């Protein structure tokens, strides 16, 4: 992908790799938009692509929506992530798909995609603290300096996902 705003990208390797494997696409003007925020719906798409590859067919998950506020383009991805226990709603049957994903939410989603936090009791009373600690232990943050409640940019999400792919160890279950 030819990126017009390459000089603005901090996490060059992460953006190059995650873009090459289909997690991110550039914009029509040739930019990547490294400072643009990632929504909760977009994060679900990224997670599905991380787990199943670009072009993952989510049509069977788009037929009935788990949440009442998810747009059609994202329904399959959000529903698949929900069925895997990777994402949760915000209450009243809502997902809040257009809200900016926070660091803590994205790290929790990545940890769950790697097999951690499969039960609500896995993180005790404070899911945010538990996700942050597990994300740190797994090396998801790398050199990123992020706060738990801060919204994430495309540049930073690329780095978190890149680290999940290259540094983190997925849970291994014994049969």
Q: What is each of the regions a protein language model found here?
A:
Residues 4-12, 25-75, 83-104, 110-151, ...:
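Feature responds to low-complexity, polar/acidic, surface-exposed segments characteristic
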Residues 15-24:
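Mature N-terminal segment immediately following signal peptide/propeptide cleavage
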Residues 154:
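Extracellular structured ligand-interaction cores
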Residues 157:
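Extended, alpha-helix-rich binding/interface surfaces that flank or overlap catalytic cores
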């Amino acid at each position: 992908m030819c990126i017009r705003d390459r000089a603005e990208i901090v996490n060059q390797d992460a953006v190059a790799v995650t873009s090459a494997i289909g997690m991110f696409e550039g914009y029509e003007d040739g930019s990547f938009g490294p400072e643009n925020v990632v929504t909760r719906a977009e994060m679900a798409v990224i997670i599905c692509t991380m787990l199943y590859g670009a072009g993952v067919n989510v049509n069977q998950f788009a037929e009935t929506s788990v949440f009442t506020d998810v747009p059609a383009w994202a329904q399959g991805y959000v529903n698949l992530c929900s069925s895997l226990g990777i994402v949760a709603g915000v209450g009243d049957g809502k997902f809040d798909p257009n809200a900016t994903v926070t660091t803590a939410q994205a790290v929790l989603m990545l940890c769950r995609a790697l097999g951690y936090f499969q039960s609500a009791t896995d993180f005790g009373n404070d899911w945010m603290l538990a996700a942050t600690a597990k994300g740190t232990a797994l090396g998801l943050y790398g050199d990123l300096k992020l706060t738990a409640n801060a919204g994430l940019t495309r540049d930073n999400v690329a780095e978190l996902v890149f680290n999940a792919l290259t540094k983190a160890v997925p849970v291994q279950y014994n049969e």
